[in-house]
UniProtKB/Swiss-Prot annotation:
Principal localisation: cytoplasm
Binding site for ATP: G31, D32, N33, A34, A35, G36, K37, T38
InterPro entries reported for this sequence: DNA-binding_RecF, DNA-binding_RecF_CS, P-loop_NTPase, RecF/RecN/SMC_N, RecF_2
Protein name stated in the entry: DNA replication and repair protein RecF
One GO molecular-function entry: ATP binding
Compartment(s) of residence: Cytoplasm
Family: Belongs to the RecF family.
Function: The RecF protein is involved in DNA metabolism; it is required for DNA replication and normal SOS inducibility. RecF binds preferentially to single-stranded, linear DNA. It also seems to bind ATP.
A biological process term (GO) from this entry: DNA synthesis involved in DNA repair
GO cellular component, one term: cytoplasm
Key words of the record: ATP-binding, Cytoplasm, DNA damage, DNA repair, DNA replication, DNA-binding, Nucleotide-binding, SOS response
Amino acid sequence: MSKILQFQLQHFRNIEQASLTFGEGLNLIVGDNAAGKTALIEAIWTLASGRSFRTAKPHQLIQQNQSELVLFGTLTEADRIHKIGLARTSDKVTLKIDGELAKTQADMSAKLPVQLLTPESHRLLEEGPKARRQFMDWGCFHHNADFIHLWRHYQRALKQRNHALKKRLPASQIQLWDAQLVDAAEKIDVIRADYITRLTPYLVEFCQALMPEITVSPECHYRPGWPKTAESYRQLLADNFAKDTLQGHTQYGSHRADIKFRFNGQEALMILSRGQQKLFVCALLLAQATLYQQHSQNPVIMLIDDLPAELDAKHRETLLKLLNLLDIQHILTSTAQDLIPVLEPEKAKIWRIQHGELIEQQ
């Protein structure tokens, strides 16, 4: 099973140093606003993904007047113990797995399958397709070992093609990249479409559990990044070559993929209330967690920042029951302990954080 046994951090945001030994179920971090609760969630997410969900400027993560931050986790995965670490300075990142240098962040992410729910998560429905692609590709990455390699090949070919388009290089040179782009895009399309097909029944199940008042089932409509009416992606590139050259970039492809969520043919964003939108995102994450567990025989780890801001008391309890049922280790933050029901005390741990200092509650 995937669990974080211990997590240590140094010089991350306002936290000088902290060490937490987590329980198997609920792990609750309680504190006032700006005490450092979100920084702990952010630190675990950064170890798992290599990036923050709060800033695109990594140097902001390093504590003021310090030159380096360090994150370290001891994990269980399929009954094996792994130790992973990340050290970051203003211009360098060092990754280690079991004492050896890791080649890529993807190697770290594969060891630490973490999902994230924050007060901003409902934007998955509101904003452009980038967040929905990231959601989909998290699942594809963990579900299909070929996906990350195909995505890298695609990104490399796309970068080279776009560079050639901007430089107005001869058509023969630009089109050299088309074959690589098409080959990777078509394989990525198959993986993504298959993943969404597998995900949808679980989404239906968790929508019913969290929103029984909605009697119609959700639908997931995957869009590959080019019109379905096109004869083929290869032909579409050829037909739009002049326009791509004029604009200096590739209009169509896997980098434009999206998912549309609908109920009875209507956009989810249009018919769901703000509260229901948050529940829908919870259902998406639970569906993804279940599919991951079915595939890997290991549960994910769920990070939830400020759960009371996300859900009312009734739905908080429902969500926590589902997380326990799925055997998902969940790490939550809240401004008050009594806002979070402790359903399985023997698997739970609670901390209070003040000014970046953690105190475990007995």
